[in-house]
């Protein structure tokens, strides 16, 4: 990655000056500032069958899951959690390795027993995008485990349990795909 350049080295820079209209003279004590690619997503490829966009990996999963819950049967409780920091190991307080989900479940259930019963009746699915086989570099993938672009969903397994996938969730997902006519 390239570090973004925002000014020449011989210039002075002050966040307080930059944000004067927002801070109205108050001192900025700390910041969480990031550079983001703000270009809109683009269709690409000879048949416009590929999407190119920044941050597509996690946002696609989150938007798809949210739309699914909004269209789901409301007689059954559903919970969607979209964690931060998946790309850096999920070990932050707002990542999947943090306590956020456990804390929320404790707040929305009556007692520990009902929380445990709810979890035992639940199915946890983690979603992500898979890196498809690039036709020019097929040897970068295992020969029997390479996702083919635009050929349907992929089920990811990890021996270190980095995904929520197990035989039960994989079987359930395959059954859902078959019933929806998805290969």
Give the label of every model feature segment:
Residues 1-183:
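N-terminal hydrophobic/helix-forming segments and targeting peptides
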């Amino acid at each position: 990655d390239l570090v973004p350049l925002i000014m020449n080295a011989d210039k002075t820079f002050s966040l307080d000056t930059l944000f004067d209209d927002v801070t109205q003279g108050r001192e900025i004590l700390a910041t969480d500032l990031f550079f983001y690619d703000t270009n809109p997503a683009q269709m690409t490829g000879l048949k416009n069958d590929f999407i190119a966009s920044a941050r597509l990996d996690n946002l696609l999963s989150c938007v798809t899951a949210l739309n699914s819950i909004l269209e789901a049967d409301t007689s059954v409780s559903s919970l969607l959690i979209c964690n931060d920091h998946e790309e850096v190991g999920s070990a932050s307080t707002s990542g999947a390795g943090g306590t956020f989900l456990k804390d929320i479940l404790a707040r929305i259930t009556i007692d520990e027993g009902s929380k445990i019963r709810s979890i035992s009746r639940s199915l946890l699915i983690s979603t992500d995008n898979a890196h498809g086989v690039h036709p020019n570099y097929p040897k970068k993938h295992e020969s029997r485990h390479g996702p083919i672009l635009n050929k349907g969903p992929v089920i990811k397994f990890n021996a270190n349990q980095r995904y929520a996938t197990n035989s039960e969730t994989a079987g359930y997902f395959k059954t859902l795909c078959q019933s929806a006519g998805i290969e």
